[in-house]
């Protein structure tokens, strides 16, 4: 399964558009407990613990996106976009793109 942020895949011809695919993951964030309790994880203003959670969430929803595209009969997803939104103590990670068949 080819995944790309571009609207085309160089050297490949798009044969069919299968539609928009999207996936989301919600991560609970308790700033007082998680951030302040893990001050040792913060290096240069970055939290290794939260970065790991974000990476895991992003990888999980990408795999789910690929599965959704496969279920539509696609072999690639083009125009991938990510969004990160904070709402109260939750972080929403979203990904979407267009499922296509390429040759």
Curated annotation (Swiss-Prot):
InterPro entries in the cross-refs: UPF0145_dom_sf (IPR035439), UPF0145_YbjQ-like (IPR002765)
Pfam annotation, one family: YbjQ_1
Top-rank taxon, per record: Bacteria
Similarity-based family: Belongs to the UPF0145 family.
Record-linked HAMAP family: UPF0145
PANTHER family with a match to the protein in the record: UPF0145 PROTEIN YBJQ
Protein's recorded name: UPF0145 protein PERMA_0324
Annotated organism of origin: Persephonella marina (strain DSM 14350 / EX-H1)
Lineage, broadest ranks: Bacteria, Pseudomonadati, Aquificota, Aquificia, Aquificales
């Amino acid at each position: 399964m080819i995944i790309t942020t571009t609207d085309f895949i160089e050297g490949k011809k798009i044969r069919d558009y299968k539609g928009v695919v999207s996936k989301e993951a919600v991560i609970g964030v308790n700033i007082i407990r998680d951030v302040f309790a893990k001050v040792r994880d913060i290096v240069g203003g970055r939290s290794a613990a939260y970065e790991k959670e974000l990476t895991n969430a992003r990888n999980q929803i990408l795999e789910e996106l690929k599965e959704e595209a496969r279920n539509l009969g696609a072999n690639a997803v083009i125009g991938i976009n990510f969004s990160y939104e904070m709402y109260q103590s939750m972080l929403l990670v979203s990904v979407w793109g267009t499922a296509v068949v390429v040759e």
